[in-house]
Regions:
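N-terminal secretory signal peptides
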Residues: 1-11, 20-21, 25-26, 34-35
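His/Asp/Glu-enriched, well-ordered alpha-helical/loop segment
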Residues: 237, 335-345, 352-375, 379-380, ...
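Non-cysteine beta-strand/loop elements that form the S-adenosyl-L-methionine
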Residues: 308-319, 396-404
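C-terminal segment of N-terminal export signals and the immediately downstream linker at the start
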Residues: 28-62, 72-75
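Divalent metal-binding segments
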Residues: 15, 19, 50-53, 62-72, ...
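Extracellular/periplasmic ectodomains of large secreted or surface enzymes and adhesion receptors
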Residues: 529-537
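Acidic (Asp/Glu)-rich catalytic clusters
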Residues: 270-272, 299-308, 391-393
């Protein structure tokens, strides 16, 4: 079955790093600031046309709710019946296909993945044999100029393949004979591998490659060599490519923990009317002074979120008070965030960390109404019922991540979290320590089986509907978006995905192969494939 270590998240990060609407927003002096002109309706990915989606199976966190949906000006007008629309309204016959709300990742390092070097073949995340990996690379090669690198940095592990081994140099050559290839995995034992053309590049940069296997002996050096040849336009293209990939899986919203430079690329796409995913940036803060500087330079002084419903500043996270998760600076920094009325997400894995952060939350709640601010602790690998109750009583939320799909350690306790009744959502924490693909996470949440097929989270499985709710309306709660997206309710944005398979009835293993054949963000088509290719924007 290969080797999947019982790695901590820190170990996964170390190894992966080695292998790896109020006002609108403008860029000035390296900061996101209020004040640029309002973008047009297309920038918000909405459509001014009327649309009827008929003969579908609309499923959200409540179960199946309708067979027909009517959309006007990007929002849901009716659920279950067709409203009277303009004469030029379009009707799309869904042919009985299952439709879910657009998936929402409650915590992801999204823009960091967008700036990975090369042309990423992220479909490798859902390859379950060497042949499928080769197919993913060969398919990506069709749209990549010859001589340009095809990559996939993080988000996969060799134990997901039926052969339970790394691909060979020869197998990568066969998949992409005209392109250099560099792929590096997440978790133990996978490392980084390249092909013949890639070997020539790395050796020219002084990076050693094992001649027979194609294993890059120093993955950090290999990644640095690739990053050294990146251009700003290449990073922008990579971010747009990632958006297209996400849309193809039905992912339409993310709470993004990224650095300022990377987030500005998403901002640039938004300003050019090319952003196709709802982006909710988080900002770090090491001290109370950092909070005040962020509020002054990056946020609205009024306490209203800067941006529109497509690109909008969310708040602060994931590490408050510095990289030390139990820093003495945590409470005063978090208190300043509460004073200014902003959302907070805090990295909190262990029981010791949970207790530290909960005590600070309790103290701050005596002075400020954090129950109105959507505060949360994230990761929660082994949180118990008592601590969940404390968090719930504070009006805060529990955001669980699925990076243990790549481990034998198990967790988070999804069943316990759902049963507690707390506001809860899920995210991937990808791509260094996990896969971006939401269907792999939904598989893990409902089966308890990891990337290698081992039962590692037994007793904490949840139903498919419960998992869907955590990945839609539940996740959207963490950025104040649950009133706008995440379920099929009149007045909400028409963010949705028409699926390739019926999520509720397919065999467990097939969940990992589900994708979207038609994705809408605010009623606008952002992804379409057969049989809906004619609707492609």
């Amino acid at each position: 079955m290969g080797r999947l270590s019982k790695l901590s998240r820190r170990e996964l990060l170390v190894r992966a790093a080695a292998g790896a609407a109020a006002t609108t927003v403008a860029v000035a002096g390296g900061n996101l600031v209020a004040g640029s002109p309002l973008a047009n309706a297309a920038a918000q990915a909405t459509s001014s046309g009327d649309l009827i989606l008929a003969n579908g199976k609309f499923v959200d966190g409540r179960g199946q709710v309708a067979t027909t949906l009517t959309i006007r000006n990007g929002r849901i007008v009716t659920v279950g019946t067709a409203a009277a629309l303009a004469p030029d309204a379009r009707t799309i016959d869904l042919g009985g296909r299952t439709v879910v709300p657009g998936l929402f990742d409650a915590h992801v390092h999204y823009t960091r993945a967008g700036v990975n070097p090369g042309y990423e073949a992220r479909r490798i995340e859902r390859a379950f044999s060497i042949a499928e990996l080769q197919e993913a690379i060969a398919e990506r090669a069709k749209s990549v100029p010859p001589g340009q690198f095809i990559t996939c940095i993080g988000g996969w592990n060799h134990t997901q393949f039926a052969e339970a081994r790394r691909p060979t140099k020869a197998e990568l050559d066969a998949a992409a004979p005209r392109h250099p290839v560099y792929i590096s995995g997440t978790g133990g034992g996978t490392g980084a591998i390249t092909n013949a053309l890639g070997t020539a590049f790395f050796e020219s940069k002084g990076v050693m490659v094992e001649t027979r296997t194609g294993v890059v002996t120093s993955a950090p050096a290999g990644l640095a060599a690739l990053q050294g040849s990146q251009t700003p336009d290449g990073k922008l293209r990579g971010t747009a490519d990632l958006n297209a990939h996400a849309n193809s899986l039905g992912l339409t919203g993310v709470v993004n923990a990224g650095n300022l430079d990377d987030q500005e690329l998403a901002l640039r796409l938004w300003r050019e009317d090319k952003l196709t995913i709802r982006m909710r940036p988080l900002f770090s803060a090491d001290s109370p002074q950092d909070v005040e500087a962020r509020v002054r330079n990056n946020f609205s002084q009024s306490g209203r979120a800067v941006g529109d419903d497509l690109f909008r500043v969310a708040g602060f996270g994931e590490r408050i008070g510095g990289t030390d998760t139990m820093s003495p600076q945590f409470e005063p920094t978090a208190r300043m965030i509460a004073k200014h009325g902003w959302l907070l997400q805090q990295h909190s894995i262990t029981t010791k960390e949970n207790d530290f952060h909960l005590e600070a939350f309790r103290s701050i709640a005596r002075e400020y109404p954090i129950d109105k601010l959507r505060w949360s602790i994230i990761h929660l690998q082994s949180i118990d019922e008592a601590r969940l109750k404390t968090l719930k009583d504070l009006g805060a939320g529990a955001s669980a991540q699925t990076w243990t799909y790549f481990s034998i350690a198990g967790g988070p306790p999804f069943r316990r979290i759902v049963d507690s009744g707390i506001r809860a959502g899920v995210g991937t924490d990808s791509t260094n320590v996990s896969a971006l693909d939401p269907w792999l996470s939904l598989f893990y949440m409902t089966t308890g089986r990891n990337v290698a097929g081992m039962l590692t989270n037994d007793g904490q499985q949840i139903s498919r509907i419960e998992a869907l709710r955590l990945y839609t309306e539940g996740a959207a709660w963490f950025s104040f978006d649950d009133h706008h997206v995440g379920s099929f309710v009149e007045g909400k944005y028409a963010d949705l995905a028409v699926l390739s398979h019926d999520y509720l009835t397919v065999p467990e293993q097939t969940i990992r192969k589900i994708e979207s054949v038609l994705t809408l963000v605010g009623g606008k088509v952002v992804h379409a494939t057969s049989p809906f290719s004619a609707y492609r924007a």
